[in-house]
């Protein structure tokens, strides 16, 4: 007969049928431990993957945030100075505030599985950088 400590639940292969039958309390305890172990494994894996994803994508996210900040800041300055005479500029400034929200910038569809940008450029950010450049040239504003 096998040592009962080989399997804390007493369910080793060498045990006879009468020993394998566990009390309802022991079955419930076994089920609870199994579920807890499963959940702990899932949580641990998620935490590890979340940290890895954060570590890999933080530099790119920070760069995109800086670029978005420059776009909004420049458009805000231009709109403040020239917006009363330029309806298109006012409209573009309001559109930029909507399109450049974080939910539109850090969307899954724009990134590869390796947390890189598709085609090495962000379509929304690049679009607005071009628009800002157009306005800066129009009003002869130096940005660098």
From Swiss-Prot:
InterPro entries: Essential_protein_Yae1_N, Yae1-like. Residues 37-77 are annotated as: deca-GX3 motif. Disulfide bonds: none annotated. GO terms for cellular component: cytosolic [4Fe-4S] assembly targeting complex; nucleus; Yae1-Lto1 complex. The lineage of its organism: Eukaryota, Fungi, Dikarya, Ascomycota, Saccharomycotina. It comes from Candida glabrata (strain ATCC 2001 / BCRC 20586 / JCM 3761 / NBRC 0622 / NRRL Y-65 / CBS 138) (Yeast). The complex LTO1:YAE1 may function as a target specific adapter that probably recruits apo-RPLI1 to the cytosolic iron-sulfur protein assembly (CIA) complex machinery. May be required for biogenesis of the large ribosomal subunit and initiation of translation. It comes from the Eukaryota. May form a complex with LTO1. Keywords: Cytoplasm, Nucleus. Belongs to the YAE1 family. One of its GO terms (biological process) is protein maturation. This is Protein YAE1. GO terms for molecular function: protein-macromolecule adaptor activity. It is found in: Cytoplasm; Nucleus.
């Amino acid at each position: 007969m096998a040592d009962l400590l080989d399997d804390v639940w007493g369910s080793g292969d060498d045990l006879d049928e009468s020993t394998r039958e566990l009390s309802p309390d022991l079955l419930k305890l076994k089920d609870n431990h199994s579920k807890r172990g499963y959940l702990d494994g899932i949580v641990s894996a998620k935490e590890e993957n979340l940290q890895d994803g954060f570590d890999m994508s933080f530099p790119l996210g920070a760069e995109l945030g800086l670029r978005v900040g420059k776009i909004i800041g420049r458009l805000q300055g231009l709109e403040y100075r020239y917006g009363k005479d330029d309806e298109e500029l006012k409209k573009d400034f309001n559109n930029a505030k909507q399109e450049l929200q974080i939910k539109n910038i850090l969307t899954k569809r724009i990134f590869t599985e390796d947390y890189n940008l598709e085609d090495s450029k962000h379509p929304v950010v690049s679009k607005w950088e071009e628009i800002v450049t157009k306005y800066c040239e129009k009003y002869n504003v130096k940005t660098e």
